[in-house]
Design a protein with these regions (language model features):
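A short beta-loop-beta micro-motif enriched in histidine and acidic residues
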Residues: 94, 107-120, 147-148
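A generic "binding-loop/recognition-motif" signal
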Residues: 116-117, 149, 159, 169
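Mid/C-terminal beta-alpha module of Rossmann-like enzyme folds, strongest
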Residues: 1-75
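Short acidic-glycine-tyrosine-enriched beta hairpin
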Residues: 134-158, 164
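Glycine- and acidic-residue-biased ligand/ion/polar-headgroup-sensing regions
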Residues: 116-134
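Double-stranded beta-helix
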Residues: 94, 103, 123-125, 135-139, 160, 164-198
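A short glycine-rich, His/Asp/Glu-containing loop-to-beta-strand
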Residues: 71, 76-111
Length: 198
């Protein structure tokens, strides 16, 4: 679905009469084996190795199928007299990027969707509402999360999402994506989670 959506977006900026989206040869057994391998790893809250664009597409399809019933994913905190450590992302192979943001009370970040990006949110300090809406649908799902009990919310592709600081103190959120940010190809499309008038 993501490749088809990208082909439609690309078609808007070309004069070509015929466009052929990229394809990958595989078998039903190959797809089943990949999905099984991904689920075995993902069931533990970890990110499986995504070797090819087809792997990314299949993993995004699996995540969409599991959403929202699979979320939030609880995280284990390891505490001692120094404080606590929480492993938020364990990725099997590949590249990725982790970053942290702070958000003032009442402020919302996001209001966009992705076609291929695998993205994970973990609130590590403060309180927030993470809201998501599937493209072309009206229903909005809200997850109320807190840094006191960190959980994982992964953003499915083709779901508009945002995060709002609902607390009275600064919100600290850790994000992980499976790709390094590329300003020339950000895979980020603006759209509000709650359109005006809804």
């Amino acid at each position: 679905a993501q490749t088809a959506a990208q082909a439609l977006i690309d078609a808007l900026s070309t004069r070509q009469q015929l466009m052929t989206p990229p394809a990958t040869a595989t078998t039903v057994r190959g797809v089943l084996d990949a999905l099984t391998r991904f689920m075995d790893v993902y069931a533990t809250g970890e990110i499986p190795e995504l070797r090819t664009p087809l792997d990314v597409s299949l993993f995004n399809t699996l995540r969409a199928t599991l959403f929202p019933a699979h979320y939030p994913i609880p995280l284990t905190a390891h505490a001692d007299n120094r404080g606590r450590l929480v492993e938020t992302v364990r990725a099997h192979g590949g590249t990725g990027q982790t970053f942290v943001s702070t958000t003032h009370p009442g402020i919302t970040r996001g209001e966009h969707f992705h076609l291929a990006k695998v993205e994970r949110f973990v609130v590590v300090g403060g309180e927030a509402r993470i809201s998501l809406r599937r493209l072309f649908h009206d229903e909005v799902l809200d997850f109320h999360v807190t840094g006191a009990e960190p959980v994982v919310i992964d953003m499915p592709t083709m779901w508009v999402h945002n995060i709002t600081n609902t607390g009275s103190t600064e919100l600290t959120t850790m994000f992980w994506t499976n790709t390094l940010f590329d300003p020339a190809n950000p895979d980020t499309y603006w759209q509000p989670v709650r359109p005006e008038g809804s």
